[in-house]
């Protein structure tokens, strides 16, 4: 068992529970007849279940899961498609399924399924991955799931993460810098063109991109959309700015008192900045950096390519999600609606993140057994 990794994860989970209670107690008190711990309890039970599943997965040899790669991909597709007739709406988005009274977010299943499927696929291709056909075959595999997440669930952030996981796993198995440089330049050019079209359309009185177009315009000038799409961003920036170096103190945030909607979700990092200041924000970022470093150490020493790719996939998932969340909160990129791993409120998210950590711990355990 990699106790360094385990300690970091347990620390982030404990800190997350504290911040979930701090950020949600006001809203819970107003919504649930004075029950200020309502969100905290739900997150606590999800965390306990997740830890139990994590240890279960960690003690199973990771190669046990390889035959389930194709079924995992198929299940991911089916669950996303089931949102069309059976989707459960929450906070203005239809991204959940209700199963036996429990909400399940298929996007989280899809991320795990994609990691497992691509790791198995790349290993089975062998040296064929280095050919142009093999390279683009792997790159195309996540596209259907990414498109479904985007169009069916309006979840652009999860679509970006799924594609990001694929690109990172592909880069590790086939480090052809020219191809990746070309892909990166094309992605940047496409994003810049989209922003240019939306801005020009807005200047001429037109409308392009619907609510996503509004989000981009609000990102460029949040004060001009202070009563609409820019409201949450501005309130988050006020929270960050008012925290100073050491913060106002744990539980002393004013922005969580109805100013930042659902502060325990995507914008929880802004409350961390307000209550714990720059010091607390840097401490959280450092913990994620150490976590990613441990992933890199384990991947570099993995017993085989399949184990290394599993760890790289989990690394990509968590790293991209952390970067996107902090970038959104600080208004570095448009609002995409993405949670902060292990810290934001969300039972499905923490459960599947801990399953992924279980896979990483299983690979780490394989390293120790190999060295004996």
Short names for language-model regions:
Residues 240-279:
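Long extracytoplasmic/lumenal interhelical loops at the membrane interface
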Residues 6-14, 22, 32-229, 270-328, ...:
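Hydrophobic alpha-helical transmembrane segments of multi-pass inner membrane proteins, especially
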